[in-house]
Amino acid sequence: MKYQLAIIGGGPAGYTAAEMAGKAGLSVVLFEKNNVGGVCLNEGCIPTKTLLYAAKVHDTALHASKYGVNVKEVSADLGKIIARKTKVVRKLVLGIKAKLTAQKVTLVQGEAYIQDAHTVRCGEELYECEQMIVCTGSATFIPPVAGLDSVNYWTHRDALDNKEIPSSLVIVGGGVIGMEFASFFHSLGVKVTVVEMMDEILGGMDKELSGLLRADYVKRGVKFLLNTKVTGVTQKEDGIEIEYTCGEEKNTVCAEKLLMSVGRRPVMSGFGLENLNLELTARGTVKVDEHLQSSVPGVYVCGDLNGVSLLAHTAVREAEVAVHHILGKTDAMSYRAIPGVVYTNPEIASVGCTEEALTREGRVYRVVSLPAAYSGRFVAENEGVNGVCKVLVGEDEEILGVHLLGNPASELIIQAGMMIEDRRKLSEWKKYVFPHPTVGEIFREL
């Protein structure tokens, strides 16, 4: 079987590329060994946001009296929350399959193996292709911890399918995944402890705002162990005992459940990638150019596999750029304004440079910061809740970075990223008319 384009991996990069190329008239074959949609749709972005929304509804009901609404009884049915999550995922997976079918994409459900730059094997079948996009994503990284193999610990996948609310939970890793699950389970009344090796949670976000978010959760009862390394775990009758060190101090913490969420690593083995002899970066990921083309002409690498930005929305844009290059259209990938969002309650979002990055690079900047209370809409909808809008501005008044704490940061960060991508100056925000009242009006107040 011969195709103009073969795509390995049906996650955000893979299905985006397949749909685009099919729509452009190319014959496309897409290989996916699990469910189309990848980790993001099936066990990542969408499932977690479905759970987090349920937790937010639960929080709203619990604290409804602040807004003059009396709710007598509030309880969470985790089984029903998980069932709804499954329904949402199934609906979106079917939607993607329908779009692929509409563009005449051949979807092969099975493990693909790359034999060379123009040949892919799946089972007993061989598929020839003129060009190839490889986007196999990433997998959960589990660090070597003494005793870990002997305890019934969770990964994010287990946490997403668990139907019983534990009494207590220790989360190893205070990154995006760890903090989102901390937010979810804390909202359901679970006693949560977060263990983080670094001196602050959410390493890639603005340090000041990350600290404010952590302080908010501390007030609500979440415990954080920073600068802390887990050295061993032991299964006990009533749960799991976690041994840890903080400096010279050794201690233990016990919980009913343990969630390991220290990060993810690109999937680079098991599908014949080595047969392509691709050039790698110093970090061991696949090296690509601004068109996402690897060192082998006609072979493109998108998403987590190239290691540049392990985010679903980055993968989607990379796929668009790769397909445009295949079609002979002018386009190039820019990582200048890739937004990052952590969907805790409240949300925290970031785009562009952080203060830490600018300081490392020796760049001159100033900070323009306002409390979210400058927005009437924010005050109306957030009783007793604080938020921050922080903008980093260069010597020429160009916007270098925007960092937000407070709902709905995930929606506001979009326009901030557009300003950074287009190299706009801070004063240019005042040229736009914002609907009133909206939280986004705060940008005009800067």
Predicted features, each with a name:
Residues M1-A13, I165-G175:
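Beta1/beta-strand and adjacent pyrophosphate-binding region of the FAD-binding site
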Residues M1-Y3, G123-Q131, E248-K257, S295:
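Core beta-strand elements of the Rossmann-like FAD/NAD(P) dinucleotide-binding domain
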Residues K2-Y3, E19-L26, F31-I165, T193, ...:
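Glycine-rich flavin
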Residues A6-N34, V39, I46, T50-V57, ...:
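Flexible, glycine-rich terminal cap/loop adjacent to redox cofactors
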Residues G11, E32, G137-S138, C246, ...:
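Short glycine-/small-residue-rich Rossmann-like dinucleotide-binding loops
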Residues A18, G22, A182, H186-S187:
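Gly/Ala-rich phosphate-binding loop of Rossmann-like dinucleotide-binding domains
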Residues D149-I165, V253-L327:
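FAD-site-proximal beta/loop scaffold in flavoenzymes
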